[in-house]
Amino acid sequence: MFILRLFSPAFGEIEADESQIFSFPEGLPGFSHLKKFLLIRHRDNSPFFFLIAIDEPEIYFILIEPSRLLADYHVELSCEQQGLLHLSEETPVLSLNIVRIPPEAKEMIINLKAPVVFNLQEKIARQIILDADYPVRYPIPLSKVKEKADAGTK
């Protein structure tokens, strides 16, 4: 197992092992040139993660586990999408959603239409556009997020 060390302007010196590195064969929309990302959890039991571009660590995304906030949100992948991610019934999967927190905002915006799905076994991931009628911009009050995050640490 190798250890990756990189410096990110937002996070400082980061040390991570290879289990936290994911390949994005097509990159992310708008960042197709970036193929390798580091996925780190904000802190234990936090619903937040950071997805940091290895080749350009100044580029990162904030992601969240939507199930921690929205009980009725479910990611259903088509057979084609499952194939692109090399998924089977037994494959461990993590589905996260990109969030945007505008400066001085009282709410954050979650993209529910296009989750980032991680194949935890093969270490590949893709942002998938769901067929379901979920919004691209779903607002959630930051107070609700803080309440749920605090509940997860107890």
Swiss-Prot record:
Subcellular location: Cytoplasm
InterPro entries referenced in this protein's UniProt entry, alphabetically: Flagellar_assembly_factor_FliW, Flagellar_assmbl_FliW_dom_sf
Keywords, sorted A to Z: Bacterial flagellum biogenesis, Chaperone, Cytoplasm, Translation regulation
KW Chaperone (keyword) present: yes
Entries under Gene3D superfamilies matching the protein: BH3618-like
Transmembrane segments: none
Main location: cytoplasm
Pfam families, per the entry: FliW
Record-stated family: Belongs to the FliW family.
UniProt cross-references to HAMAP family, sorted A to Z: FliW (MF_01185)
GO cellular component: a single term: cytoplasm
The gene coding this protein: fliW
Protein name as catalogued: Flagellar assembly factor FliW
Subunit-level organization: Interacts with translational regulator CsrA and flagellin(s).
GO terms for biological process, alphabetical: bacterial-type flagellum assembly; regulation of translation
Function, in words: Acts as an anti-CsrA protein, binds CsrA and prevents it from repressing translation of its target genes, one of which is flagellin. Binds to flagellin and participates in the assembly of the flagellum.
